Amino acid sequence: MMLFAGIDLGTSGIKIALVDENGACCATAARASPVDIPHPGWSQQDPDQWWHLTVECFDELAADHPALMARLKAISLSGQMLGQVLLDKADRPTTPCILWNDQRAIAECAELLERVPDIGLRTNGQPDPGLTAPKLLWLTKHAPAALDTADVLMLPKDYVRLCLTGERATDITDAAGTMLMDCASGAWDDELLAAAGWDRARLPPLMQSCAPAGQLRTELCRRWNLQDAVLVATGSGDNYAGAIGVGASVPGRAALSIGTSGVLSAVDASFHPAPDKAILTTPHAAAGTYLSMGVVMAATQSLDWLARLTSTSAADLASLAEVRAAAGIAACPVSRPSITGVRSPDNRPDASAIFSGIMAGHDKADLAYAVLEGVAMQFYAAYQAQRASGVPVDHIQAVGGGTRSPFWVSLIASLLDTEIAIPAQGDISACLGAARMAMAASDPERTVEILGMQKPPLLTVEPVAGLRDQLLTRYAMHRRLAFTP
């Protein structure tokens, strides 16, 4: 049986999974990838760091699992989205990659909107500092040399694939987050490019996520003792790969990612844009479908922030919150845990976190509950916007670190009034999705079958009886906080 490697380039690290033809994970390797925060609101990484860590992971797999690696047939990638990777003619980075959660380009968002008033209709989203185009404008003002020497603009996973193959390319899902592509047509838009100070000549070929993008370089095959030529598929943005990893490739299926950020991704057969609600709808990695995404800027990141503040682990805080909720939630504070701004549905990148109703008797358990509930309510606000635009949000599977707290998932299930399945190996869903794209590139006639594979869930979380009414009462208070300066 042949194996397939799925690389997940995340914000916090690199993971690689070796997956068999049935979608089962056979081996993994991972490395942490620190984020550089040189100024408040900034968030960046060195692209070379991603490549070095990828090599370390493959070195580990080759050393510990040589028999498995010898059966490797194809590789594909999932990557954190929106970060600009500018490369010179020698394919060397000209500047650090400004990440998806960076806030430095707020002023440039207004400039883009002024230059292209209908930008929301073309890109299905309003300008946000995390997106790629505003960053290009910011670099024009503050680091022009990085732009002057740049020969191509790529996205994070594209740089790793370039190092694997020597070939430049990007895919339609990652391109959709740049604000340089018309999301309805799936093509680069020259007016958007001009508004961002960029040009088509400095863009890579635009490919489908499951398309072959090259072969693994010969020297890497030798380094890892691979027997045959290894195909490398284009890959996709992480939210798309995570959805594919749980079989969310056909209309009516959805994926709920509770990671550093949070994303509710729903597969749709039709294009239902909702740019006024900051819901991003783009072509999916499963060709012929669309993915509607409601984004929570800080999900587990909000709990991690409170963990640092209280010198308590995130897991312990989640447990304390569950105990507090069992005693009643009416007296708990209400929070807007938007420590990195708000995306869906209010599009307020400048928003800060708020706790309301804190009293002398409250403790870290109350604050922990308020954070978990606040994130759940942000998911619910995005869900309402998606449903209002005509997107089916059904058959939800939850992945990401937040699923380690079934209580947290139960808050979301109660608000959405639907059961949520937690799949086995949901923590590597993006790796699994990338591996499936590698399989599809190797056997294109089975693409629909491969991308839609689903396994029985590890756990199904039901709405808590009687909780929804209590949460909706508190949701009204939460929504009032949404528009507080």
Indicate residue ranges for each PLM-predicted region.
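Conserved small-residue
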Residues: 16-18, 23, 75, 102, ...
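Structural signal for short hydrophobic segments within the conserved structured cores
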Residues: 27-31, 204, 459
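Active-site core segments that coordinate phosphate-bearing ligands/cofactors
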Residues: 5-6, 106, 110-126, 130-131, ...
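N-terminal glycine/serine-rich phosphate-binding loop of ATP-dependent small-molecule kinases
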Residues: 1-95, 149, 221-222, 226-234, ...
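Short beta-strand-loop/turn "lid" adjacent to the catalytic site in phosphate-handling enzymes
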Residues: 65-100, 125-130, 161-182, 205-208, ...
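Gly-rich Lys/Arg/Thr-decorated short loops/hinges at beta-loop-alpha junctions or inter-strand turns
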Residues: 34-44, 119-120, 169-176, 199-202, ...
